[in-house]
Amino acid sequence: MTALNQAHCEACRADAPQVSDEELPVLIKQIPDWNIEVRDGVMQLEKVFLFKNFKFALAFTNAMGEISEAEGHHPGLLTEWGKVTVTWWSHSIKGLHRNDFIMAARTDEVAKTAEGRK
C-alpha cells in the first residue's frame, strides 16, 4: 500500500463509500496526531498547528490552499494569530473518505517544512 503522504486523491462522488469501521483504525494509525471530531453527525479529521505569529500561520494556510487545489480536495481552514486549525472531511458523502486521510498526511508533510512553527 502506498504511504498516505505519497498517495493522490480520487474523485469522490455522492455515492462513494465512507471509510469503513475496519479501515478507520488502520488509517488513523498513519496520522496519529489527528483527532476525529463529529459535527452535526459528520465525522471529520482535525488538527491544530501552532506558529510564532499570524504571518507564518497565513503562509501555512496559503500552502495548504495550493496542495488542496492541486488535489481537488479542500479542507476547512481556520487561521488565527499563531494558529491554524485544519479540518478534513468529504462534503459529498458527509463523512470520511480515504482522500481525507491522504490529505491529512499531506498536511503533516507541508507542516514539517513550514516556517515559524512552534
From Swiss-Prot:
Q: Which InterPro entries match?
A: PCD_sf, Pterin-4-alpha-carb_dehyd, Pterin_deHydtase
CDD domains hit by this protein: PCD_DCoH_subfamily_a (cd00913)
Q: Give the EC number(s) listed in the UniProt record.
A: 4.2.1.96
What GO terms are given for molecular function? 4-alpha-hydroxytetrahydrobiopterin dehydratase activity
- What's this protein's family per the entry? Belongs to the pterin-4-alpha-carbinolamine dehydratase family.
Task: Tell me the organism.
Answer: Pseudomonas fluorescens (strain ATCC BAA-477 / NRRL B-23932 / Pf-5)
Catalytic reactions on record: (4aS,6R)-4a-hydroxy-L-erythro-5,6,7,8-tetrahydrobiopterin = (6R)-L-erythro-6,7-dihydrobiopterin + H2O
Could you list this entry's UniProt keywords, alphabetically sorted: Lyase
Q: What is this protein called?
A: Putative pterin-4-alpha-carbinolamine dehydratase
Q: Does the keyword Hydrolase apply?
A: no
A Pfam family that this protein carries is Pterin_4a
Keyword presence, DNA-binding: no
Q: Which GO terms describe its biological process?
A: tetrahydrobiopterin biosynthetic process
- Top-level taxon of the source organism: Bacteria
